[in-house]
């Protein structure tokens, strides 16, 4: 007998009996520890330590607890699986019941239709029988007619049986059509889901394209604003050009005045030279007592002064001759500019904005060069007049001549410096004009790319709309065909019934 303090376990479990799944030896280690579970330790004759026995019992108890826990978890898992299987079974059973109910309802509807059809046929038969009775009462003597009527009735019965067989066949065909329609509905539902996903992708793509279009429109607006600014700049340059032309006219008038003053100065210079020659002759007559050496020196001095004066006069004449062709050259572009202004609008409209801008820039540059030349000419003439005035004011002609030569050298150096500065400025202006032309070409290229992109997007959207419309038309054309096949069977049965009724009425 076991002691009361020892744990009690099922006999099947401790004996290593059948497992929950039916397998033998599910827990083989229990048989090995059976004696320890049952408390059947060693006898008093076996010399073992009591502490080791207690430790062994504790280990066995822990193993038993773990085993019970595992069994409980296994039982819980099996219970959950059983519940899920029960729920699945119930759902499957409900679905089958619903389908059975729907099939029964369809069968009942078909039975009601066929019963109504049979009632109609029975009514026709009764009417035929009444007609047959009338014919029998009216034509009792005509046996051949009765035989013929009986033959017709037998034929009608045969036709009715054939119609019933045909009705059963049509019912089977309708059932098959119903199955095919269900399959088509499922396929259409799948196709609708695919179309919805595709529509969402197309909407996202359309939104992206609209955002890009808005960005490009903003760029176009910026480009248009820049073009407007360029046109405003062109208008301002045109106004500046008109102002420069007015200034050029004023400079021409000043040049004419300066030339007139230079002519007067030359005339006064010649008068002064004649006066000096007269004074020299008087001084020679008065100073006859002076030695030959002093006379020779005075003659040499007078000859040098005459040569210097002639050279100065020649330089003034050369400057006038140089100024006159330059003024002619500056005046010669005027008619060309006027001709360009008076040019017909058709020729100017045929040019591109870049070419017009280039022409305007060339005109402005040419006018600026002309203005600088006129200013330099005016400055030289003013300096020349100032020198002439100083020469007139001075008593010593040698100092005046030396100062005039030094001023001339300074003027030449200044002219060289100004020409170098003018060439540098013209180079800078050319580089700026090239940069401006490059920017305008980039703007034109961007506008062309934008127009090409808009055309491509319109083509893509049109193709997508056409493909979607063709799909809708094909689906709409397929639906009426199915309806035609369904209604043709029903109309065939109705027409046969009408033929029988007409035949009985004739008889």
Swiss-Prot record:
Residues 1-22 have a biased composition (Low complexity). One of its GO terms (molecular function) is small GTPase binding. Residues 1-27, 324-349 are annotated as: Disordered. InterPro entries: Spindly/BICDR_Dynein_Adapter (IPR051149). Residues 64-292, 354-459 form a coiled coil. Keywords: Coiled coil. Residues 324-337 have a biased composition (Polar residues). Transmembrane segments: none annotated. The keyword Cell wall biogenesis/degradation does not apply. The keyword Nucleus does not apply. Interacts with RAB13. Belongs to the BICDR family. This is BICD family-like cargo adapter 2.
């Amino acid at each position: 007998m076991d002691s009361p303090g020892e744990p009690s376990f099922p006999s099947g479990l401790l004996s290593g009996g059948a497992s929950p799944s039916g397998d033998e030896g599910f827990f083989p280690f229990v048989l090995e520890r059976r004696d320890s579970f049952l408390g059947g330790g060693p006898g008093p004759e076996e010399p073992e330590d009591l502490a080791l026995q207690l430790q062994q019992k504790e280990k066995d108890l822990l193993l038993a607890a773990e085993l019970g826990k595992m069994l409980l978890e296994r039982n819980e898992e099996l219970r959950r699986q059983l519940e899920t299987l029960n729920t699945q079974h119930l759902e499957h059973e409900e679905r089958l019941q619903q389908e059975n109910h729907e099939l029964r309802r369809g069968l009942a509807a078909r039975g009601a239709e066929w019963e109504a059809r049979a009632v109609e046929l029975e009514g026709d038969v009764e009417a035929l029988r009444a007609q047959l009775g009338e014919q029998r009462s009216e034509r009792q003597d005509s046996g051949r007619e009765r035989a013929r009527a009986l033959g017709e009735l037998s034929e009608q019965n045969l036709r009715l049986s054939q119609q019933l067989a045909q009705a059963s066949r049509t019912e089977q065909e309708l059932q098959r059509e119903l199955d095919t329609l269900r399959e088509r509905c499922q396929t259409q539902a799948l196709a609708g889901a695919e179309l919805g996903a595709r529509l969402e992708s197309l909407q996202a793509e359309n939104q992206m394209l609209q955002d890009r279009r808005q960005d490009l429109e903003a760029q176009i607006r910026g480009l248009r604003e820049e073009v407007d600014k360029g046109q405003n700049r062109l208008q301002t340059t045109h106004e500046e050009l008109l102002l420069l032309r007015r200034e050029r006219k004023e400079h021409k008038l000043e040049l004419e005045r300066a030339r007139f003053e230079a002519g007067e100065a030359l005339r006064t210079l010649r008068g002064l030279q004649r006066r000096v020659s007269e004074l020299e002759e008087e001084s020679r007559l008065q100073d006859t007592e002076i030695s030959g050496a002093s006379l020779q020196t005075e003659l040499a001095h007078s000859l040098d002064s005459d040569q210097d004066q002639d050279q100065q006069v020649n330089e003034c004449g050369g400057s006038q001759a140089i100024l006159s062709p330059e003024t002619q050259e500056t005046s010669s572009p005027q008619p060309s500019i006027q001709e360009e202004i008076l040019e017909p609008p058709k020729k100017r409209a045929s040019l591109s904005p870049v070419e017009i801008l280039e022409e305007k820039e060339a005109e402005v540059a040419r006018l600026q060069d002309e203005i600088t030349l006129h200013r330099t000419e005016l400055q030289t003439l003013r300096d020349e007049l100032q020198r002439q005035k100083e020469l007139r004011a001075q008593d010593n002609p040698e100092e005046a001549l030396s100062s005039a030569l030094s001023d001339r050298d300074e003027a030449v150096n200044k002219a060289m410096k100004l020409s170098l500065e003018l060439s540098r400025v013209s180079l800078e202006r050319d580089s700026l004009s090239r940069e401006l032309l490059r920017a305008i070409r980039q703007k034109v290229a961007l506008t062309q790319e934008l127009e090409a992109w808009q055309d491509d997007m319109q083509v893509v959207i049109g193709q997508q709309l056409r493909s979607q419309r063709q799909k809708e038309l094909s689906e709409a054309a397929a639906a009426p065909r199915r309806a035609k096949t369904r209604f043709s069977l029903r109309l065939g049965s109705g027409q046969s019934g009408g033929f029988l009724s007409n035949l009985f009425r004739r008889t």
